Structures are given as structure tokens and as C-alpha cells.
């Protein structure tokens, strides 16, 4: 991510987080940030987010807080004897609410950080009590003003309204063709019109227009996207929607006429850098480019 908003992407490579800079020759150069951002080979960096002078780093072994001013880091982990510790160590996604609260998604619910007590309040699903969430497997989090959207692996979309503590669940209903196309949700994106785009696993791309409760489906079978597993969504400075898929490359779409992609980007394995399996897309307004995280590299 462009943590410093200077056109240089923070990226984890072999256990260390570097800044990646595009050169005038079209190459990518990496530079060290701090010795505190060197961890160990094999660590999975799942997400990063800036909050004031700190950077929160989600991994598969816990949540790290890096203070840029003091050049220090701290690890937060699950403690079975502490209900205010992280609910689980495998982090999936991070988000900041409009009132500057940090939310951390895991494979066992969501966690809201309390800076006063330096611990967490948990949002989890339980079959034995009234739960705010209907699934603990959180894939992605999207903040939209007073609403927080959670994309889950098995429960579709959960919409949380914190002030009223209300959850609205959007799930696939085989009897309702205007419901969510499938329940495993990889990514949620809100465009400038307030419409919600939802990428699912094998269910294609979903569009929920602002003010409606119905989902429009875009699928590979109808030639609307190149693959039904949608893994990343972002727009560029021309208002186009970039749709990353896991197995079909990248689709560039016009949000006002999304029935056919404007362009599909992919490369074959023999090129040495296949662009079939896309994990993340990040638009870079400084360099007017798109950073592409694929299964074979950046």
C-alpha cells in the first residue's frame, strides 16, 4: 500500500517490508524502511494500514503496530485467557472507521482496537448467543460512513451500523435471483456513486446500487467477466473499474455499462510473469499507474 502517500508502495518481500519505487526506465527498485520492519522468512503479510504516525501490519501470526516516530514495533496476539486480546492470530484485513477506530478482521471474527486500554473488543459469531456477525471467517472489511461492511467466507455480507448496533445480513438465496450470487465474499468496493461492488468466490461480480436491496450479477458464462472468482476491485482516474480475478487476469470495466469488459489483461506462462491469478490491485495517482500483486510477484 501507498502508506506515505508519495507514490511508493510498501510491500512485504521474504519477511521484510520495503518501499517499492518505479524508475524512469520502467523498473522497480526496493529500499529499506527500518530494521524494525524486518521479520523472518515465511511470514505472511496480509494487510497494512496507516493510522496517524503508526502503521498496523496484519500477518498470519498476529497484528504488529509500527510507530514511525519512535521506530518501534509491538505484536498483538491471541491469549486464550484474555477475552480482550485478539480473537485469533491469522489476520485477513484492516480498516479505519470515520471516527479513527481500527478494525481487524481474522479467521475468528472482527476486533475493534481500544487505544485507551491498548486491547480489543471482539465481534464474533456464536451459536449459543445473539451474535452481531453470522460468520467468523472475515475476508474483507469496507467502511462507508456510518456503515461497516464485512465480507465473509460463509455468511455473505454483514452490514454493521455501530451507533444503533444493527447488523443486516446479505446472503445467497436460491429462491431469490436478486440476492447475493454466492456467500464466499473476497472483496467489497464502493464507487463514487455510492454503489457497492462485491467480488465472490466462483459467484462472479455483484453490483448493489445505492438505495436498493437487490444485487445484479456479472458472470463468466455470459461473457461479462473473464472468471467467476473476483479477488480485487479498484477504480482509476478515468472512473474505470479494474476487476482482478483468481484465474482470469484483469478486467477493465465501465461502471455505467458493465455488461462487457472494455479490456481483459492477462499474459501466458511462457512470458515468465503470468497475469492470471491476481491477489491485489492498487491505483497509484502519483505515477498514474496500477500496482498488480499476482501469485508470481509484483
What are these language model-derived features?
Residues 1-298:
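Carboxylate-rich, polar loop motifs that coordinate divalent cations or form catalytic acidic clusters
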Amino acid at each position: 500500500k501507498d502508506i506515505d502517500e508519495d507514490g511508493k508502495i510498501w510491500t512485504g518481500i521474504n519477511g521484510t517490508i520495503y518501499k517499492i519505487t518505479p524508475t524512469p526506465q520502467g523498473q522497480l527498485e526496493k529500499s529499506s524502511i527500518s530494521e524494525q520492519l524486518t521479520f523472518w522468512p515465511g511470514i505472511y503479510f496480509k494487510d497494512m494500514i496507516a493510522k496517524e504516525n503508526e502503521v498496523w501490519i496484519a500477518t498470519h501470526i498476529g497484528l504488529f503496530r509500527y510507530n514511525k516516530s519512535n521506530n518501534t514495533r509491538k505484536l498483538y496476539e491471541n491469549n486464550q485467557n484474555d477475552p480482550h486480546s485478539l480473537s485469533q492470530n491469522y489476520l485477513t484485513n484492516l480498516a479505519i472507521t470515520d471516527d479513527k477506530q481500527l478494525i481487524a478482521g481474522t479467521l475468528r471474527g472482527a476486533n475493534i482496537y481500544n487505544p485507551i486500554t491498548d486491547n480489543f473488543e471482539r465481534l464474533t459469531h456464536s451459536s449459543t448467543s445473539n451474535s452481531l456477525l453470522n460468520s467468523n471467517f472475515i475476508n474483507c472489511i469496507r467502511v462507508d460512513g456510518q456503515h461497516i461492511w464485512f465480507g465473509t467466507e460463509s455468511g455473505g455480507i454483514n452490514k454493521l451500523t455501530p451507533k444503533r448496533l444493527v447488523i443486516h445480513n446479505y446472503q445467497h438465496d436460491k429462491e431469490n435471483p436478486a440476492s447475493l450470487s454466492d456467500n464466499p465474499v473476497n472483496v467489497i468496493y464502493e464507487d463514487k456513486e455510492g454503489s457497492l461492488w462485491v467480488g465472490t468466490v466462483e459467484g462472479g461480480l455483484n453490483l448493489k446500487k445505492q438505495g436498493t436491496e437487490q444485487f445484479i450479477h456479472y458472470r463468466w458464462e455470459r461473457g461479462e467477466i473473464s472468471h467467476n472468482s473476483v479477488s480485487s476491485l479498484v477504480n482509476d482516474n478515468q472512473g474505470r473499474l479494474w476487476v482482478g480475478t483468481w484465474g482470469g487476469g484483469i478486467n477493465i470495466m465501465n461502471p455505467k455499462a458493465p455488461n462487457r469488459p472494455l479490456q481483459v489483461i492477462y499474459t501466458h506462462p511462457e512470458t515468465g510473469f503470468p497475469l492470471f491469478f491476481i491477489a491485489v490491485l492498487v491505483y497509484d495517482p502519483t505515477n498514474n499507474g496500477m500496482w498488480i500483486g499476482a501469485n508470481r510477484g509484483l
